[in-house]
Structures are given as C-alpha cells and as structure tokens.
Design a protein with these regions (language model features):
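Catalytic activation segment of kinase domains across protein kinase-like and atypical kinase folds
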Residues: 54-138
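Short, solvent-exposed segments of well-ordered alpha helices
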Residues: 3, 25-32, 36, 48, ...
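Acidic, Ser/Thr-rich intrinsically disordered and amphipathic helical segments
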Residues: 11, 15, 30-33, 37-40, ...
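Short, flexible/disordered secondary-structure transition segments
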Residues: 19, 49-58, 63, 68, ...
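Helical subdomain adjoining the active site within ATP-dependent kinase catalytic cores
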Residues: 121-176
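Extended HEAT/HEAT-like alpha-solenoid repeat tracts in very large eukaryotic scaffold/adaptor proteins
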Residues: 2-9, 86-91, 138-145
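Conserved kinase catalytic-core helix
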Residues: 24-53, 58, 67-68
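Conserved structural core of kinase catalytic domains
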Residues: 1-29, 101-107
Length: 176
C-alpha cells in the first residue's frame, strides 16, 4: 500500500496565454477585468489559507466561457462589479503553493534543499537556521505575474524606455 494523490480540475476552455497570443488582442477593459478577477481570487485564497501560489504566470491562468455579464465581489466592506467579457478566469497549478489548512502549513518539496526552488524561502519545514529567515510573501504572486506580462508587452528590455509614456497612460499597466 502507498498513498495516492488525485488532483481533479474543472475542464477549462483555454489559458490566458492563448488569449494573448491569439489573433485578437485583449482590449484594455478586457485586461482590467481579467486582472481584477485574478486579484480577487488571490485575495480570497490569501485571506482563507495564508496562500502563496509561487508560480503564477499567464499559462497558469485558465478561463471558462460564461454568459454572466458581471461577477460580484465583496472585499473589506466594498462591493465590486467586474465585467466578465464572456470569461471567468481560473488559477491553476498549485504544485508550488504554500498555504495553511487547519493550523498546519503545507509546503511543496520544491522548497526542500534538493528541490528546484530551494533558495526561494527559508522557513519551516525546510528552515536553515544558519541563514536569515525568509517567509512566503503574498505579494510574490502578483510580482511573478507582472514579470510574465512585462515580458509579453515589452519585446526587448533595451526598448523599455519607448514604452514608458504609453505605460503611464495605460490603466492596465498601472494595475500591473
């Protein structure tokens, strides 16, 4: 006998990557709605589970098509009505996630000394007391996502200055 883990997932239509690389680029309102859906999901996960995804990029965000026009969120006493533009975004691939459940912190073995993410954090259960403590940070997920989006919007880092005026005007860029 050995333990078996089974991961089930809703069948999704495609990834955010597919929308970015498709024929029709996302409009600014579609980008804003997409990012707000992802941010609201992260807020809920972080609040309920002290959650950090640790690998949030555009291929780990999928969507299902919907006829719902809006999604409604309540956060810190404020209601948000976010248009769907026909898509509900889903965060996937929790293989590197760190979260708390029933008082216990769940950590992937990717963060073990032999794992491919060994030096990202220094905390239990893989704490090295000889090094400074470095706990998971919920802001990491949006930073990681922003890096993958930056890579999409800016082809060559040497040309980033050309985008600076455009980025200052873009509501989506200011969100990222």
């Amino acid at each position: 006998n050995f333990p078996v883990h089974a991961i089930m997932m809703e069948k999704c239509d495609n990834t955010l990557d597919s929308l970015m690389c498709g024929k029709n680029e996302l409009t600014e309102p579609e980008w804003a709605a997409t990012l707000l859906q992802v941010i609201m999901a992260l807020i809920a996960y972080q609040h309920m589970f002290a959650f950090t995804h640790n690998d949030l990029h555009t291929n780990n965000i999928m969507f299902v098509k919907t006829d719902k026009v809006f999604l409604h969120y309540l956060h810190k006493g404020t209601y948000y009505r976010v248009p769907t533009h026909g898509r509900i975004m889903k965060i996937i691939d929790f293989g590197r996630a760190i979260y708390k459940y029933r008082g216990k912190t769940m950590v992937s073995d990717s963060f073990d000394r032999a794992g491919d993410a060994a030096t990202q954090y220094n905390c239990e259960p893989y704490l090295n007391p000889k090094k400074p403590r470095l706990d998971p940070n919920p802001s990491f997920d949006l930073c990681r996502l922003a890096c993958s989006l930056f890579d999409y919007f800016v082809e060559d880092i040497r040309d980033a200055a050309e985008y600076s005026a455009t980025l200052k005007e873009s509501r989506v860029a200011r969100m990222v």
